[in-house]
């Protein structure tokens, strides 16, 4: 690569003509005076970049010239060019100006109304003040409230009556004047520290009560459980008839387990347990089938019981004397012997709607009673 030096400089007339013709192009005249042999890298690193002249073209290289965009790298060394930044003026924090609230009527005091009341009570020797005395102390010590709208007095009254830190003390008979006094409640006296009324944090039990403590009334689909309801018996026509076991309601099986244990806690509905309202048609059909079967079984049972009682009375009229009646008083009757003990159905413990489909039909249950 030929090295440009001063010996290759063109005549001055030719340079002037080229400058006139190529004013729109980037000026590269500094390349003619550049020589790699005479350059000092240390001086280039410490020197500031030259300020472009007005006559020079734009600083960005022309399109397609990628040589000036990226400098060659030698190994892993990196040359950093320090730039001499002008020292920026540092913003010094402005000193906080103390405001005299007794004379300055344009600045509102940064205290709450409850704090103002506490400050007035602390300044008093008796630690109890009337409402008018609290007004006077605030207006004397804070000029803002002297010229402000008198609506702030309503806020003072509301804080005295609603804030639990203040309590009203009745006026004694020997004390002149009208109205009662206001003072701080001794239980909350520790909240007023260094002229500021602090607020206590609510305990976690009040902020997040457990959801399981919510109780509900009887659900319309849940049967009301009564103690001893499964052991009651009906007496009809001189013969005792055992009461059939109540079938569980298949509408809401998820609520039956808490009800059997006597628990009234609210349990959220689980959509996987089949208690959604989408299955109301199927559940209503199952309930109607169960009720029809129960009615048919009860009618057949009542007719069979009545016929058996009439047959016994017609067949054994001469044997009903006092001696036979007394001898059979401690024994079980024929119908009691025939009766089978009512066993609690296993599906009452599970709570699935599908158990209703596998229940024995009503005509088979009638045969067991005969």
Curated annotation (Swiss-Prot):
GO cellular component entries: nucleus
GO molecular function annotation: DNA-binding transcription factor activity, RNA polymerase II-specific; RNA polymerase II cis-regulatory region sequence-specific DNA binding
Top-rank taxon, per record: Eukaryota
Keyword Zinc-finger found: no
GO BP term, pick one: cilium assembly
Keyword RNA-binding: no
Location(s), subcellular: Nucleus
Region (Disordered): 45-74, 227-246
Keyword terms of this UniProt record: Activator, Cilium biogenesis/degradation, DNA-binding, Nucleus, Transcription, Transcription regulation
Chief place where the protein resides: nucleus
InterPro entries the record matches: FH_FOXJ1 (IPR047512), Fork_head_dom (IPR001766), FOXJ1 (IPR047513), TF_fork_head_CS_1 (IPR018122), TF_fork_head_CS_2 (IPR030456), WH-like_DNA-bd_sf (IPR036388), WH_DNA-bd_sf (IPR036390)
DNA-binding residue intervals: 108-202
The family this protein is said to belong to: Belongs to the FOXJ1 family.
Function in brief: Key transcription factor required for motile ciliogenesis. Activates genes essential for motile cilia formation and function.
Protein name, per record: Forkhead box protein J1.2
Organism in which the protein naturally occurs: Xenopus laevis
């Amino acid at each position: 690569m030929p090295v440009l030096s001063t010996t290759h400089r063109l005549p001055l007339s030719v340079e002037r003509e080229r400058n006139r013709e190529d004013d729109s192009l980037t000026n590269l005249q500094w390349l003619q005076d550049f020589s790699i042999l005479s350059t000092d890298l240390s001086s280039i690193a410490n020197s500031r970049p030259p300020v472009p002249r007005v006559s020079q073209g734009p600083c960005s290289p022309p399109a397609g010239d990628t040589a000036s965009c990226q400098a060659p790298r030698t190994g892993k060394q990196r040359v950093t060019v320090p730039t001499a930044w002008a020292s920026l003026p540092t913003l010094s924090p402005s000193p906080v100006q103390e405001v005299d609230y007794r004379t300055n009527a344009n600045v509102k005091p940064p205290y709450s109304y409850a704090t103002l009341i506490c400050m007035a009570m602390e300044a008093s020797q008796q630690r109890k003040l009337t409402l008018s005395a609290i007004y006077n102390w605030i207006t004397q010590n804070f000029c803002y409230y002297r010229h402000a709208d008198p609506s702030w007095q309503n806020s003072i009254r509301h804080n005295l009556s609603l804030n639990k830190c203040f309590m009203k003390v009745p006026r004694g008979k020997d004390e002149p004047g009208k109205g009662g006094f206001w003072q701080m409640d001794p239980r909350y006296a520790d909240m007023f520290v260094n002229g500021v009324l602090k607020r206590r944090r609510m305990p976690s039990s009040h902020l997040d009560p457990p959801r399981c403590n919510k109780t509900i009334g009887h659900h319309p689909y849940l049967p009301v459980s009564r103690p001893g309801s499964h052991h009651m018996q009906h007496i009809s026509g001189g013969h005792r008839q055992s009461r059939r076991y109540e079938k569980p309601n298949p509408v809401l099986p998820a609520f039956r387990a808490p009800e059997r244990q006597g628990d009234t806690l609210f349990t959220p509905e689980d959509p996987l347990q089949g208690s959604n309202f989408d299955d109301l048609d199927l559940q209503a059909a199952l309930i109607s089938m169960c009720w029809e079967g129960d009615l048919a079984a009860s009618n057949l049972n009542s007719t069979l019981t009545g016929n058996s009682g009439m047959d016994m009375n017609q067949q054994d009229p001469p044997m009903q004397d006092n001696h036979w009646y007394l001898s059979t008083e401690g024994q079980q009757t024929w119908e009691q012997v025939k009766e089978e003990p009512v066993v609690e159905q296993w599906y009452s413990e599970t709570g699935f709607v599908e158990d209703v489909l596998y229940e024995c039909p009503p005509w088979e249950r009638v045969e067991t009673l005969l």
